[in-house]
């Protein structure tokens, strides 16, 4: 019987539930699971039925190419709070909503092998390059806006308890009081731009900052957030 259960996705997070604290067994089982599916770079939420050495577990998951983002409120909560690792409420899944509009950028890539002797002209095929989701309404508590293949532009604010998650950049032209997660899947060049920063959590490519650690000099200001050369979050106030 497996000691790790992958019970599905919470938005675009995968929830891992551990029934063992034997990290050798966890490594062995997860390696097998990861080899069978496309989980590389996946953002994961941690739950456990047994006590864990949380820091060691997080390091183990990172070494396997996963991105631990938070724990579910429960056995792991106290240890997570002690290291300022995010804790999510138990059994309160968010409602994934549809963006007001989605724009798809496509490119034509030459397929050199498919040429004809008469013309020697490469046959082209169309591939999706990038998507941008536009949303014009306030993101309410319990709602989540997700773009797995590009950027999000939110032309309104977001309430506490809401989430915006993009594999690329995030632009929010309003108050940010929820959780903003850019570069989901491991894109370190992703950036966040927001009109008024009061976020509960900020993350780019798995590097996160909880509300208490956001620099006080950028709170409620227009901010540009990115990863520096040391893969640390930088918060730059925008002057207009």
UniProtKB/Swiss-Prot annotation:
Keywords: Cell cycle, Cell division, Septation. Pfam families: MinC_C (PF03775), MinC_N (PF05209). GO terms for biological process: cell morphogenesis; division septum assembly; regulation of cell division; regulation of cell septum assembly. Disulfide bonds: none annotated. The keyword Cell cycle applies. Interacts with MinD and FtsZ. Belongs to the MinC family. Cell division inhibitor that blocks the formation of polar Z ring septums. Rapidly oscillates between the poles of the cell to destabilize FtsZ filaments that have formed before they mature into polar Z rings. Prevents FtsZ polymerization. This is Probable septum site-determining protein MinC. The gene is minC.
């Amino acid at each position: 019987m497996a000691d790790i259960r992958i019970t599905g996705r919470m938005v675009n997070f995968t929830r891992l539930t551990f029934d063992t604290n034997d990290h050798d067994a966890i490594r062995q089982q997860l390696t097998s699971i990861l080899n069978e599916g496309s989980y590389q770079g996946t953002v994961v939420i941690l739950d456990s039925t047994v006590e864990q050495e949380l820091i060691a577990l997080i390091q183990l998951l990172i070494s396997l190419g996963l991105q631990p983002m938070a724990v579910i409120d429960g056995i792991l909560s106290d240890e997570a709070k002690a290291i300022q690792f995010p804790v999510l409420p138990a059994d309160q899944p968010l409602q994934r909503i549809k963006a007001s509009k989605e724009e798809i950028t496509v490119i034509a890539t030459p397929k050199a092998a498919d040429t004809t002797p008469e013309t020697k002209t490469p046959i082209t095929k169309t591939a999706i390059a990038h998507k941008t989701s536009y949303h014009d309404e306030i993101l309410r508590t319990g709602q989540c806006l997700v773009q797995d293949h590009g950027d999000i532009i939110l032309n309104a604010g977001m309430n506490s308890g809401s989430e915006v998650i993009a594999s690329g950049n995030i632009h929010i032209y309003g108050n940010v009081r929820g959780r903003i997660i850019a570069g989901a899947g491991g894109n370190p060049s992703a950036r966040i731009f927001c009109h008024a920063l009061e976020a509960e959590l900020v993350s780019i490519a798995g590097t996160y900052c909880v509300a208490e650690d956001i620099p006080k000099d950028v709170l409620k200001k227009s901010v540009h957030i990115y990863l520096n050369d040391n893969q640390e979050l930088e918060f730059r106030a925008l002057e207009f």
